[in-house]
Amino acid sequence: RYRTEEGSIESRCAHAARTFDLTRREEEVLALLLKGCTRSEIARELFVSGDTVKTHIRNLYRKTGVTGKDELVQAIGGKGLV
């Protein structure tokens, strides 16, 4: 799990959304990923299916140019966001 302050995650996700042209839902999924939530936890939190979460995560990876969660956190960190 990645540890950082709640407000910090929200503001950094908002900045990432602008930087990478994320949808509002992708931004929400990103915030939950950064809080350490699993795919199934994200699905329950957002009232969507696991497949929908998987699609949002795939879109996050594509838009940010990464291939995994750790790399996603690094990519955002590289932009001065995390």
Language-model region placement:
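Pre-recognition alpha-helix immediately N-terminal to the DNA-recognition helix
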Residues: 27-31, 71
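Recognition helix of helix-turn-helix DNA-binding domains
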Residues: 36-71
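Short helix-to-turn junction characteristic of helix-turn-helix DNA-binding domains
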Residues: 33-37, 76
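Basic, Lys/Arg-enriched C-terminal extension of HTH/homeodomain DNA-binding domains
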Residues: 4, 13-17, 58-82
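Regulatory hinge/linker segments at domain boundaries
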Residues: 2-28
